[in-house]
Amino acid sequence: MLLEGHQGDIFSLEFHPEGQYLASTGFDRQIFIWNVYGECENISVLTGHSGAIMELHFSPDGNHLYTASTDMTLGLWDIAAGTRIKKLKGHTSFVNSVSGARRGLTQLCSGSDDSTIRVWDPRKRGQCYTLNNTYQVTAVTFNDTAEQVISGGIDNDIKVWDLRKNSILYKLKGHSDTITGLSLSPDGSYILSNAVDNTLRIWDVRPFAPYERCVKIISGHQHNFEKNLLRCAWSPDGSKVSAGSSDRFHYIWDTTSRRILYKLPGHNGSVNDIDFHPKEPIVCSGSSDKQIYLGEIETVQ
């Protein structure tokens, strides 16, 4: 199923936690909400950012959306009302990434070209913490308990920050180019990273993991001169991983064997973001060709 309507590159998309909706956004500064079933019609458009939206995520309960934009702000959106309820200011350059806490109180973390990571409590006016990184930050995510923020940037290292001490707990070294996407596994034990060195890596982020935390290196997809922030994702059961690719294909691998299970064609531009449906064998991809594909994959027993 092809979903059309965006006027520019699509940078980010995600299924609703219950699976009935899909949200997408990108260069045109608009957030589209689509029905996943039936005719897949566009049911609402949210506007308010004055710059490209680099990343969006649903809140765990599915009632809100979080967005990061090149207008240097984060947005917190009420999906039912179709309005932005909070505009979080503080970054001094493009915001490349946003992530929400999986459980507990609503917290957001963000990463920016201003070389900071910020952790926000949207119920309070200002941000909670600022973590100073030396280089631009391109991807962030919380760990499972939201006591740590995991960040990636143009210095090739993934950093795990302890929010109680405001310091780096440890670094995950191995990528040889910019980190473009980070995704925490469904069980919270592993982090998936996508980088311009044309590899995906899986890292063990459990507290007492062995010293060598890189457990898998996966390849097959491509990055190119466009330097888009190609994201990555886990299937709900953790058995598959997927990544954006500049060669116009949507790749899905088996997590254990690292084998390419699917190389899905159709796009005419870089595939920037992908997602797995939370309940069914459906995947989606968003591309610089302004189009979204929804497709079914077979369930491998």
Show which residues each predicted segment covers.
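A short helix->beta-strand "capping" segment at the edge of beta-propeller domains
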Residues: 1-7, 215
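Loop/turn segments within WD40 beta-propeller blades
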Residues: 13-19, 57-62, 99-105, 141-147, ...
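Conserved strand-to-loop turn within each blade of WD40 beta-propeller repeats
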Residues: 24-28, 67-71, 110-114, 122, ...
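Per-blade loop-tip surfaces of WD-repeat and WD-like beta-propellers in eukaryotic adaptors/scaffolds
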Residues: 33-55, 59-63, 73-97, 101-107, ...
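C-terminal amphipathic alpha-helical segment
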Residues: 190-207
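Loop/turn-rich, solvent-exposed surfaces of beta-rich toroidal or solenoidal domains
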Residues: 223-252
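Blade-level signature of beta-propeller repeat domains, shared across WD40, Kelch, NHL, RCC1
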Residues: 275-301
